[in-house]
């Protein structure tokens, strides 16, 4: 018997944003594992699933482990155990399975080693509705970075002349650490926007100075922070572009 894991994206918000393929998978599968029930569309999905179907959440694993790496390893182990005893297991994750989802590559690796097929069912990621909420086209140089990575840096490894979206600013302490890193490159009064529940009915935007980013209480698993670019020619990258232009064949003859 062939075994298969179907990783399904729940999208960023309400059930209306689910793809048809995701809806069909979630409402008809015999076994569904939710990485978390803390998602706007989960309640309606559960209401539409047959009473005889098996559904399990992984929220309990977040309280059993202190480090995210251990949580993700436990989630992968849970899905793999079910996949080895059932023909198909649907594993549902927020957003898109391949955007900011650490369990997806880990599960793909474990499944490949066990000879279990993996199928990705796409979902709308948080990126599109977040950029849409602040009126920015991400194709205009948009940068998307996990807030945790920025918080671990002393100086932000970003281009300050381009739009920046910080993902998963889920707690006030994380917002504080992010703020301290960003203040090494942006002025205190630089206006940033906290994007809450992008694309959902309860979407909220709060614009405030960077120095006050961590003053509010509006941080959870649906929170992103948008940082607008600084004026042109205010970064080292811009200086490199200027020097390259001057030294180019069509540049300044004195600099070649």
Where do the model's predicted regions map?
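Class I S-adenosyl-L-methionine
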Residues: 1-121
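Beta-strand/loop-alpha-helix module characteristic of Rossmann-like adenine-cofactor folds
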Residues: 2-8, 24-27, 31, 37, ...
């Amino acid at each position: 018997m062939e075994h298969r894991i179907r990783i399904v994206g729940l999208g960023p918000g309400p059930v209306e944003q689910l793809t048809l393929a995701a809806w069909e998978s979630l409402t008809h599968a015999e076994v569904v594992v939710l990485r978390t029930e803390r998602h706007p569309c989960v309640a309606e999905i559960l209401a539409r699933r047959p009473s005889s179907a098996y559904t399990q959440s992984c929220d309990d694993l977040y309280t059993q482990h202190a480090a995210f790496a251990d949580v993700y390893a436990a989630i992968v182990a849970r899905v793999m155990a079910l996949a080895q005893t059932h023909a198909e297991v649907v594993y549902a994750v927020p957003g898109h399975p391949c955007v900011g989802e650490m369990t997806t590559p880990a599960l793909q690796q474990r499944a490949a080693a066990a000879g279990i097929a993996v199928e990705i069912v796409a979902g709308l990621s948080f990126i599109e509705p977040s950029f849409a909420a602040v009126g920015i086209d991400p194709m205009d140089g948009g940068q998307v970075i996990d807030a945790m990575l920025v918080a671990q840096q002393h100086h932000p490894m970003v281009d300050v002349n381009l739009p920046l979206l910080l993902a998963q600013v889920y707690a006030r302490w994380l917002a504080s650490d992010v703020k301290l890193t960003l203040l090494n490159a942006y002025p205190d009064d630089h206006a940033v926007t906290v994007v809450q529940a992008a694309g959902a009915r309860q979407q909220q935007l709060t614009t405030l100075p960077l120095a006050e980013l961590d003053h509010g209480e509006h941080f959870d698993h649906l929170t992103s922070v948008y940082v607008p670019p600084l004026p042109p020619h205010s970064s080292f990258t811009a200086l490199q572009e200027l020097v390259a232009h001057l030294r180019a064949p069509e540049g300044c003859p004195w600099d070649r």
